[in-house]
Amino acid sequence: MVWALGLMSGTSLDGVDAALIETDGVRIGRIGPSLTVPYSPELRGRTRELLDRAAGLAPDDAEVLAVTRELTLRHVDAVRLLREKAPGLEPAVIGFHGQTILHQPERGRSWQIGDARLLQDLCGVPVVHDFRSRDLENGGEGAPLVPVFHAALLHQEVRPVAVLNIGGVANVTVLGQQEPNGQRGVWACDTGPGNALLDDWALQHTGQPCDFGGALAASGAVHQDVLERLLAIPYFARPMPKSLDRLSFHPEAMACVRDLSAADGAATLASFTVEAVAGTTFPVRPEGWFVAGGGRHNPVLMDGLNHRLGNVASVDVLGWDGDALEAQCFGLLAMRFLRGLPSSWPGTTGVRQPCIAGRAV
């Protein structure tokens, strides 16, 4: 096994997560340290503006190029700081996801900005990037890619279980009952909104980047009629696998809640996230749910999930770092690329056949 360094900047647009894991691409050995380099308010704002306009932008747009460079330099900072934090754990490879500004699987397109060559040149470590393109080219959704990592972490768990990641978008990995030969089914999809709608609502009404501790949602009431309109969006009737962009049905959802008070809107949007998960049909019924991502810190979401699903806990009870999982995942995916191992399957992304993810610089 070798040390791999994974980098992830998610749809919450809060910064760059960097993490070290020891892996051969199949097994996970030691879990190294991790850290987050936050985006400045200015960089977050510029990135959000690109995200809002991405469908009409060209890769050589001046602002795209400028933000790409700034984001890449934040990733360089993250690598430098993590190497300083763990001087004896030198990475053999970096898995670089980049910042998603557009995800349109129905058009075969997913756009992550970031300069992999600049990152490799400044860090002096081989970089693997562009993890979604090949899956899309082979009929897949290009997301989610984390199931192979969840399966590796839970290789000793024999029950059917689910790992729910609540970032800007919520995605779930469902692992079937483990057979005596060690084989098990793996399925995945984006269930619906995670924190993105709540974050945008909180920013609009309180000036804060998120609903800290779920306080705003906890003080409000769910408007059932509005919730029913939100859940009638056609995406929720589609079978898995399926995936979303951060702004999928964003205007429609915000229009539904615009006349509500700040507290009631937050409560209704939180319930939207919960009900989208609870309403997703899986091939097997999970006996346990483990929640990762920023959403696990929101008591309103966690209480709602426990009420609807039962047996829901934070991944922290497993000893995992729920804020570093996706960064750790891209360390594993980079090693799988180097070994020629697939990272997506028909049950996880809808790809036609098992597919290797990534590309070397």
Swiss-Prot record:
Gene3D superfamilies, alphabetized: 3.30.420.40
Enzyme class, broadest EC rank: transferase
Residues that coordinate or bind ATP: 10-17
Q: Which GO terms describe its molecular function?
A: ATP binding; kinase activity; phosphotransferase activity, alcohol group as acceptor
Domain of life per record: Bacteria
- Catalytic activity, as annotated: 1,6-anhydro-N-acetyl-beta-muramate + ATP + H2O = N-acetyl-D-muramate 6-phosphate + ADP + H(+)
Key words of the record: ATP-binding, Carbohydrate metabolism, Kinase, Nucleotide-binding, Transferase
NCBIfam families in UniProt:
PRK09585.1-5 (NF007141)
- State what this protein does: Catalyzes the specific phosphorylation of 1,6-anhydro-N-acetylmuramic acid (anhMurNAc) with the simultaneous cleavage of the 1,6-anhydro ring, generating MurNAc-6-P. Is required for the utilization of anhMurNAc either imported from the medium or derived from its own cell wall murein, and thus plays a role in cell wall recycling.
Q: What does the sequence similarity comment in the record state about its family?
A: Belongs to the anhydro-N-acetylmuramic acid kinase family.
Name this protein carries in UniProt? Anhydro-N-acetylmuramic acid kinase
The organism's taxonomy opens as: Bacteria, Pseudomonadati, Pseudomonadota, Alphaproteobacteria, Acetobacterales
Chain's gene name: anmK
